[in-house]
């Protein structure tokens, strides 16, 4: 199973939010490039970077920092946040991203996703952000009357192969991931799933790893790493156990 440390960017800093709320922000570092280097030195093989300013603004806002992270990291970097046009997507790829996560635009303009997949193939990932089973968009400030699994199936029909699945109610809470919802998404959505939100312990990682045969291929770790619940080395050992 793939373990991806998260670097969430706001105003050029490395932060974490609680359930996606700006007013519930914790600043972990003013030097996200150093943070990226640190995760790679500890064994990270991928990084997951989110442009929070971009998610709220509707267009990437931290491209210079993202490009610097990618140059410094030397490992593949998956980038999301505010990428709502083909132009923005191309800009993030030009900055060096290995994969790009499309969220809001996949709901509001799925034709963009279809074109992106035609051009870039598996470098295009969809972000499925779920609140009580419904899809959330625009930096999680709004929900739409679409079931998350139904949405995943639509994305699979467009040629998407992979999704980052976040249960917003668990994000940043350290309450454990929503295993039932993640299992349902992996079984029924037709996409490979990278799980995100609420992972608090090595046992949580083990539970997600048990879903590998059903399509859960990775986990994104944020607050649990930054708060020291466990080390990245420990997480990588759990992820590799039995592989």
Swiss-Prot record:
Entry's Gene Ontology cellular component terms: cytoplasm
Signal peptide: none
Active site: 8, 129
Family, similarity comment: Belongs to the HisA/HisF family.
UniProt EC number: 5.3.1.16
Name of the top EC class for this enzyme: isomerase
Source organism of this protein record: Moorella thermoacetica (strain ATCC 39073 / JCM 9320)
Chemical reaction(s) catalysed: 1-(5-phospho-beta-D-ribosyl)-5-[(5-phospho-beta-D-ribosylamino)methylideneamino]imidazole-4-carboxamide = 5-[(5-phospho-1-deoxy-D-ribulos-1-ylimino)methylamino]-1-(5-phospho-beta-D-ribosyl)imidazole-4-carboxamide
UniProt entry tagged with the keyword Hydrolase: no
Highest taxon listed in the record's lineage: Bacteria
Protein name in UniProt: 1-(5-phosphoribosyl)-5-[(5-phosphoribosylamino)methylideneamino] imidazole-4-carboxamide isomerase
Swiss-Prot/TrEMBL keywords: Amino-acid biosynthesis, Cytoplasm, Histidine biosynthesis, Isomerase
Subcellular localization(s) per the UniProt record: Cytoplasm
InterPro entries according to UniProt: Aldolase_TIM (IPR013785), His_biosynth (IPR006062), HisA_bact_arch (IPR006063), Isoase_HisA-like (IPR044524), Isoase_HisA-like_bact (IPR023016), RibuloseP-bd_barrel (IPR011060)
Main location per the UniProt record: cytoplasm
GO biological process, one term: L-histidine biosynthetic process
Pathway: Amino-acid biosynthesis; L-histidine biosynthesis; L-histidine from 5-phospho-alpha-D-ribose 1-diphosphate: step 4/9
GO MF term list: 1-(5-phosphoribosyl)-5-[(5-phosphoribosylamino)methylideneamino]imidazole-4-carboxamide isomerase activity
PANTHER family named among the record's database cross-references: 1-(5-PHOSPHORIBOSYL)-5-[(5-PHOSPHORIBOSYLAMINO)METHYLIDENEAMINO] IMIDAZOLE-4-CARBOXAMIDE ISOMERASE (PTHR43090:SF2)
